[in-house]
């Protein structure tokens, strides 16, 4: 029998799963259809398509983990189950983080303006090497997830301790104690791509500030398209920073949940908050991307007309 908190958790996480799959699936479908029609795909759409596929995987793993915690709270007392879940989560998490970083760096290189030789070289090369960059993201994520699996597999101490525990809650606390260091370490490693995105964000803001100063010197009274592009990219990157911060805090909460008396409630709350990152940022991308937004509006308009008829 589920508690009221468990019922609320299942309802919320199911809703997030549906919205996440629909939102990210919509982006992938639109870009795929456009790719088929035009026989080519832009760099930003190519990065976005890979990103939403990674996010669908991340949302799925997080939802499975959340449901398993509710249905089978002693899952963390079983080495194999924990290793499998954590390995898949690590892979999807890192792949999502690095591809998002690629998207943010791409926005910066394509929108910002600078005369620095390194910037100009990267701006010229980005379209040519994007496939290799994304392949590198996949390789890094796979390597980190394999290392995570090996690290967790090498530590069997919790089996010996858990065998002497009868209470599931005690077993949960004991089984998670050996994983404190690796879990924390792998969470901290995710800061690396975030820092790269943060640097790109501040450099883009600096570029907008310099561009605005130039516009004021030669003001014509009309809206500047370059400024609008700058602002739209900054909004996208700001939403990423906000949702990632929420995601990171939620991950830390779940990592340290074994220290709390209401550990299960802490994990459930952390799961719900964490899924907002791959869900919310993708919805923001739809709103701020002209092509995705216009197609979505047309779909709603056609649906309304069909309902009237």
Curated annotation (Swiss-Prot):
It is found in: Membrane. Belongs to the G-protein coupled receptor T2R family. It is a multi-pass membrane protein. This is Taste receptor type 2 member 8. InterPro entries: GPCR_Rhodpsn_7TM (IPR017452), TAS2R (IPR007960). It comes from Pan paniscus. One of its GO terms (cellular component) is plasma membrane. Residues 29-50, 104-131, 206-239, 288-309 are cytoplasmic. CDD domains: 7tm_TAS2R8. Most taste cells may be activated by a limited number of bitter compounds; individual taste cells can discriminate among bitter stimuli. The chain crosses the membrane at residues 8-28, 51-71, 83-103, 132-152, 185-205, 240-260, 267-287. Residues 1-7, 72-82, 153-184, 261-266 are extracellular. Glycans are attached at residue 167. Keywords: G-protein coupled receptor, Glycoprotein, Membrane, Receptor, Sensory transduction, Taste, Transducer, Transmembrane, Transmembrane helix. Receptor that may play a role in the perception of bitterness and is gustducin-linked. May play a role in sensing the chemical composition of the gastrointestinal content. The activity of this receptor may stimulate alpha gustducin, mediate PLC-beta-2 activation and lead to the gating of TRPM5. Its main location: membrane. SUPFAM superfamilies: Family A G protein-coupled receptor-like (SSF81321). GO terms for molecular function: bitter taste receptor activity; G protein-coupled receptor activity. PANTHER family: TASTE RECEPTOR TYPE 2, TASTE RECEPTOR TYPE 2 MEMBER 8.
């Amino acid at each position: 029998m589920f508690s009221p908190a468990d019922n609320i958790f299942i309802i919320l996480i199911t809703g997030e799963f549906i919205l996440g799959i629909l939102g990210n699936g919509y982006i992938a479908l639109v870009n795929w259809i456009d790719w088929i029609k035009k026989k080519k795909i832009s760099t930003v759409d190519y990065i976005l398509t890979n990103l939403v596929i990674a996010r669908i995987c991340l949302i799925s793993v997080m939802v499975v983990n959340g449901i398993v915690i509710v249905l089978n709270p002693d899952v963390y007392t079983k080495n194999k189950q924990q290793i499998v879940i954590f390995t898949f989560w690590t892979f999807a998490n890192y792949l999502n983080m690095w591809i998002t970083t690629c998207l943010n760096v791409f926005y910066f290189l394509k929108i910002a303006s600078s005369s620095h030789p390194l910037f100009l070289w990267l701006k010229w090369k980005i379209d040519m090497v994007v496939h290799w960059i994304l392949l590198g993201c996949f390789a890094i994520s796979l390597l980190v997830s394999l290392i995570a699996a090996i690290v967790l597999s090498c530590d069997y101490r919790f089996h010996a301790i858990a065998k002497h525990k009868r209470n599931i809650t005690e077993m949960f606390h004991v089984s998670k104690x050996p994983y404190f260091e690796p879990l924390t370490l792998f969470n901290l490693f995710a800061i690396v791509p975030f820092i790269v995105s943060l640097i790109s964000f501040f450099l883009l803001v600096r570029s907008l500030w310099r561009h605005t100063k130039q516009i004021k010197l030669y003001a014509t009274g009309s809206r500047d398209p370059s400024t609008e592009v700058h602002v739209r990219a900054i909004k996208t990157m700001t939403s990423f920073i906000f949702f990632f911060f929420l995601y990171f805090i939620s991950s830390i909460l779940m990592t340290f949940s074994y220290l709390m008396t209401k550990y299960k409630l802490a994990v459930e709350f952390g799961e719900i908050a964490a899924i907002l990152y791959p869900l919310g940022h993708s919805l923001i991308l739809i709103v701020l991307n002209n092509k995705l937004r216009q197609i979505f509006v047309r779909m709603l308009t056609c649906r309304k007309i069909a309902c009237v008829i």
